C-alpha cells in the first residue's frame, strides 16, 4: 500500500471528523460535534497555529495527525506539539502512523522547528512501539489542571 501524507484540505472534513471521533473514543472521551467543528475551523484558518495532516491510500484518508506550532522558551524557533494521531483500525500496522510522523520530522527539519514532541498513555504499548522508532521517552511527568 502506497501512503501519501499531505496537509488536510476542506474536502477532508467528513473523514477527518470520523477519525477524530475515533481518536476521542480511544481516549474514552465522547465525540463532541461542537469541539470537532471548532477544531476543524482552526485547522483551516491560516492565522491559527493549529494544523492537520492526513494519510491517504488509494484515494481514501486512513489516518490523521493534528499538531500545534508554538513559541518555546528553550528554543530560538517554534516547537511542534503533536496533539492527536489516529489511524483507521483496519489500516494499522501498515506504516501509516510512521508515515505521518515521518512527514512531521521532515517539516521540522525543513522549517527549523526546535523540536517535535508528543505524549501518550504509559500503557498504550502499540503506539509506544511506533514512537520508540523515533525517540525514547523521557522521564517527565505531565500535570494537568482543568478549568471546572
For the regions a protein language model found, what residue spans apply to each?
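Residue-level recognition of the GNAT/N-acetyltransferase active site
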Residues: 70, 88, 121
